[in-house]
């Protein structure tokens, strides 16, 4: 869901050429699987195109290649840190909801986990969390000067 939401926001802002967005699993349970039907349905309901993909395992090379690695929950963060060798030496690993509200506070929050629809069945809540995190991430990049401050990020 997060890959599709962030891709959609970036496209709306005409920033496609400034981003490479990908997603990867931090555990092996879903390797090779497409997005869950609940995710597909929620994205369709919100008129957000699904980025077609099948789950792949995150690797240490991802850490070396990408500028940011964003996990949805504490377990993701632990797994990501383990995969990259036990330490986030380049300060690239973040929890999605640490960005939520960044536009108001200009600082990271003590973020809770994104609501996991695997347990809750509530794709609406997950979607709201993901949108808040993605928008906050874009505000963060804007404050850092990585994207223009003149670009208006949708509320």
Predicted regions and their residues:
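Phosphate-binding/catalytic loops
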Residues: 68, 74, 78-155
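Conserved active-site segments centered on acidic
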Residues: 1-66, 140-155
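Short secondary-structure boundary segments
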Residues: 1, 73-74
């Amino acid at each position: 869901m997060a890959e599709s939401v962030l891709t959609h926001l970036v496209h709306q802002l005409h920033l496609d050429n400034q981003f490479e967005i990908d997603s990867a699993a931090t555990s092996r349970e879903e390797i090779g699987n497409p997005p869950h039907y609940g995710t597909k349905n929620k994205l369709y309901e919100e008129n957000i195109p699904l980025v077609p993909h099948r789950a792949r395992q995150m690797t240490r090379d991802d850490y070396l290649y990408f500028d940011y690695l964003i996990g949805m929950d504490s377990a993701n963060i632990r797994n990501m840190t383990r995969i990259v060798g036990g330490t986030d030496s380049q300060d690239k690993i973040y929890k999605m909801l640490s960005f939520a509200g960044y536009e108001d506070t200009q600082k990271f929050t003590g973020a809770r986990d994104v609501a996991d629809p695997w347990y809750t069945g509530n794709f609406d809540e997950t979607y709201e969390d993901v949108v808040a995190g993605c928008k906050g991430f874009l505000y963060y990049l804007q404050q850092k000067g990585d994207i223009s401050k003149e670009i208006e990020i949708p509320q």
